């Protein structure tokens, strides 16, 4: 920076509209944020989860991308070669829904939305490398995905089988268990049905141990996310054993609590278990019950909370230790996909079994108690799942739970009726989807050769453009020509696979394509080695299981087949909070239902609010997540147009810790806009010719630079904002001096990652370079240590005065200064000081 001259004097007010447009154009022209693969600088890969192109950026996106942008800009200032890309998770059902509702092609609808959202992102001034932009709906991307899918197939990690699936009868597609919410499709809301279809699967279960053990290395991930993945993978160790049945058959069950085997009072099988199906074949009531079960929830979480229903098959299961016969039920809460599809039910020590036994008047036996004397203690209306000692359990009596588990497994294995076994909750990933707008699965079905992979030289298998969405279902299946093709092996007429890949496949490797984009292969392994893992990944907690687990699996699968060396894609993960807003509503006088109004329709009046059109009051509701249905949304474009990009960026970083929800406030954004102007005025006071020293301000400035750097690196943006406010106030109060001008310069550099347009506009008055290319201010380590400290003085435990003294002042001097204080003497009221406790540099406590 050079001295401000009359020729470079600043206008009185900062004009966001002009500055935003100017500097965004300059950054584009100079390609300021394009990552250089040939750079020798240390590398930093900052990535926010890429959005689905719905057509509009919402305020939650702004918060997410602002956080990543601040970190990316900061890393550039610290000398890193930064990769900060953006793209579009562009396949999926909403585009097909739009095609059906509006008569537009999914591709055109999606690309128009991308153009709109890209323009919105640019207006916010994000330091993105647009040269690496990808859209998963483009053949350049999904063709490489098809190649990777074939590589995994060749390695035995992709297979096809008939399986029971969750079928959405409205969207007419298969849903993963995670996409079924309360028994309904996550997009359509339709009740999900069970069907059997031939499906393509990825063998994620081959990586269950790796994925579980790998969580222990992710110490920069939120504990909550790691626990969620651990539970989803669901490793359990227990006993698998056989019950001999009264009809001459046997049933295998799996239990994680073999210690409670003497407490079993019934056996339950899943509705689609072979025993259940056999009973249904000869019993209409059983068949009707199974049909009823298929209409209910399909996930473990849903079945856990649903009413427990059962059907007595009339079959008995002989207990392997007591010889008694237990009734066998078909139960709606047993999943065929977990364990063996049959369970040993112990009502006394499992709440689900307790509820079922209570409903059907089955015995509830106590086999674990806090003390042996409690063997006959009745249950207090619920199961007891805690630890204790074994009771009413024959040879297990008196053992603790762990020893009893081991003893039962030893007994079962020695007598040949069971064996210890590890079971996983995780299931192979079904990736077939019966829809058009997705990546075509690159296989051909030939009556002579069977299932044949498409040769890589014929990739990409592209989607046909001439499709119709007049009726639900998969247009690819109905297409008159696209699916008809000659077999690449024998030349006979064959047909293409008409299923497309689950869109979560697209987002399971996009971070690799951002890092390297050769035309002839998915990526260059050497570039992946240099850029990966992503240093900082930012996105919502809602992706803890689906996207994040699948991305971890995909990376490990590619590592196993030698495509990459990295095994964990994201070194550090941050899950940001939502942006929330109060609702405004009235009750419909006819039906009592709420009628919601947008913030723009409402006028706030003190503690209340009125509707602008009629002046009548509206009810101010709770502060909740912004949603279109509640109309409590704020349009980022309107905010940028009114206040400028820097004001909304600053608001997103202020007040709330970034992992917590951020309540939107009109007063808050107005305050941010005022602070932008306040800084502008302060930057205009820089004077390179100023002389004189202000040691306290020097120390404050250097300490703030150091602290803000630490805050940004820890993603503690609200703390960084608070420190910048403090330094701003200190500089404003300081008299003109060289120290003050230096502090102004440092302050300008500090806000550059957060308010880049304001910073560029101010920086331009002092030279020709961009602040986007400037270095982070240096700090003097000697100034990071305070020479003076404030020591609290207490009398009888209450604060009465403070002493500002040199650091390291001896105890005797602190005691003398404390006793000399007039405030202390007044507090003592002439009483004799019996004891003085001194904590150097912190506290003097006088006991009278």
Curated annotation (Swiss-Prot):
GO terms for biological process: leucyl-tRNA aminoacylation. A motif ('KMSKS' region) lies at residues 625-629. Its main location: cytoplasm. It holds the Pfam family tRNA-synt_1g. GO terms for molecular function: aminoacyl-tRNA deacylase activity; ATP binding; leucine-tRNA ligase activity. It is an enzyme of class 6 (ligase). SUPFAM superfamilies: Anticodon-binding domain of a subclass of class I aminoacyl-tRNA synthetases, Nucleotidylyl transferase, ValRS/IleRS/LeuRS editing domain. ATP binds at residue 628. It catalyses: tRNA(Leu) + L-leucine + ATP = L-leucyl-tRNA(Leu) + AMP + diphosphate. Belongs to the class-I aminoacyl-tRNA synthetase family. PANTHER family: LEUCINE--TRNA LIGASE, MITOCHONDRIAL (PTHR43740:SF2), LEUCYL-TRNA SYNTHETASE (PTHR43740). This is Leucine--tRNA ligase.
């Amino acid at each position: 920076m050079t001295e401000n001259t009359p020729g470079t004097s600043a206008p009185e007010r900062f004009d966001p509209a002009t500055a935003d447009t100017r500097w965004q154009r300059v950054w584009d022209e100079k390609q300021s944020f394009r990552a250089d693969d040939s750079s020798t600088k240390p590398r930093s890969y900052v990535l926010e989860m890429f959005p689905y192109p719905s057509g509009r950026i919402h305020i939650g996106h702004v918060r997410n991308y602002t956080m990543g942008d601040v970190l990316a800009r900061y890393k550039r200032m610290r000398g890193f070669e930064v990769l900060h890309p953006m793209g579009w998770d562009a396949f999926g059902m909403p585009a097909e829904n739009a095609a059906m509702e509006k008569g537009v092609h999914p591709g055109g609808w999606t690309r128009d939305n991308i153009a709109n959202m890209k323009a919105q992102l640019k207006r916010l001034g994000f330091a993105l490398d647009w040269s690496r932009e990808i859209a998963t709906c483009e053949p350049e991307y999904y063709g490489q995905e098809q190649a990777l899918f074939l590589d995994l197939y060749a390695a035995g990690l992709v297979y096809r089988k008939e399986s029971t699936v969750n079928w959405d009868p409205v969207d007419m597609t298969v849903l993963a268990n995670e996409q079924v919410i309360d028994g309904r499709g996550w997009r359509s809301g339709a009740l999900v049905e069970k069907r059997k279809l031939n499906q393509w699967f990825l063998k994620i279960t081959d990586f269950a141990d790796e994925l579980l053990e790998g969580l222990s290395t992710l110490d920069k991930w939120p504990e909550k996310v790691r626990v969620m993945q651990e539970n989803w993978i669901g490793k359990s160790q227990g006993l698998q054993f056989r019950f001999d049945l009264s009809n001459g058959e046997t049933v295998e069950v799996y239990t994680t609590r073999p210690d409670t085997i003497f407490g079993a009072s019934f056996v339950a099988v899943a509705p689609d278990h072979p025993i259940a199906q056999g009973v249904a074949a000869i019993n209409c009531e059983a068949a009707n019950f199974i049909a009823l079960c298929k209409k209910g929830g399909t996930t473990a979480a849903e079945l856990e909370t649903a009413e427990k229903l059962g059907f007595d098959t009339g079959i008995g299961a002989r207990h392997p230790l007591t010889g008694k016969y237990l009734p066998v039920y078909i139960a709606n809460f047993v999943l065929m996909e977990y364990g063996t599809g049959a369970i040993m039910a112990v009502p006394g020590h499992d709440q689900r079994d307790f509820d079922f036994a209570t409903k059907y008047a089955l015995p509830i036996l106590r086999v674990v108690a806090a003390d042996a004397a409690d063997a006959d203690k009745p249950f207090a209306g619920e199961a007891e799942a805690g630890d204790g000692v074994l009771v009413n359990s024959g040879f297990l009596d008196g053992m603790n739970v762990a020893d009893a588990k081991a003893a039962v497994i030893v007994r079962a294995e020695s007598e040949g009726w069971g064996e210890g076994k590890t079971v996983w909750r995780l299931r192979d990933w079904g990736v077939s989807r019966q829809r058009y707008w997705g990546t075509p699965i690159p296989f051909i079905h030939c009556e002579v050769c069977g299932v044949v992979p498409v040769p890589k030289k014929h990739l990409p298998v592209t989607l046909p453009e001439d499709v119709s969405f007049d009726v639900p279902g998969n247009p690819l299946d109905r297409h008159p020509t696209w699916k008809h093709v000659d077999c690449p092996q024998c030349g006979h007429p064959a047909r293409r696979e008409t299923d497309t890949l689950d869109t979560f496949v697209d987002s399971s490797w996009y971070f690799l394509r951002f890092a390297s984009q050769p035309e002839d292969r998915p990526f260059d392994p050497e570039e992946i080695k240099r850029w990966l893992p992503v240093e900082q990944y930012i996105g919502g907690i809602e992706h803890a299981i689906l996207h994040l687990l699948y991305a971890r699996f995909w990376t490990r699968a590619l590592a196993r087949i030698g495509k990459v060396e990295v095994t964990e894609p994201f070194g550090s993960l941050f899950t940001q909070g939502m942006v929330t807003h109060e609702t405004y509503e009235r009750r419909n006088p006819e039906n009592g239902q709420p009628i919601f109004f947008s913030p723009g329709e409402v006028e706030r009046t003190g503690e209340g609010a009125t509707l602008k059109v009629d002046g009548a009051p509206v009810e101010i509701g709770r502060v909740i997540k912004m949603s279109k249905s509640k109309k409590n949304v704020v349009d980022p474009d309107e905010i940028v147009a009114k206040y400028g990009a820097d004001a909304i960026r600053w608001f997103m970083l202020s007040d709330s810790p970034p992992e917590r929800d951020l309540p939107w406030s009109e007063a808050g954004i107005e305050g941010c806009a005022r602070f932008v102007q306040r800084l502008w005025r302060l930057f205009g006071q820089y004077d390179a010719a100023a002389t004189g020293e202000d040691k306290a301000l020097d120390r404050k400035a250097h300490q703030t630079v150091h602290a803000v750097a630490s805050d940004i690196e820890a993603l503690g943006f609200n703390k960084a904002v608070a420190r910048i406010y403090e330094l701003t106030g200190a500089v404003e109060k300081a008299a003109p001096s060289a120290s003050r001008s230096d502090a102004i310069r440092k302050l300008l550099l500090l806000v550059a990652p957060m308010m880049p347009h304001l910073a560029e506009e101010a920086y331009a008055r002092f030279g020709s370079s961009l602040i986007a290319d400037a270095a982070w201010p240096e700090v003097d380590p000697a100034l990071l240590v305070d020479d003076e400290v404030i020591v609290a003085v207490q009398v009888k435990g209450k604060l009465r005065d403070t002493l500002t003294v040199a650091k390291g002042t001896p105890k005797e001097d602190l005691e003398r200064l404390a006793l000399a204080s007039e405030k202390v003497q007044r507090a003592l009221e002439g009483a004799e000081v019996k004891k003085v406790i001194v904590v150097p540099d912190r506290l003097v406590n006088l006991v009278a």
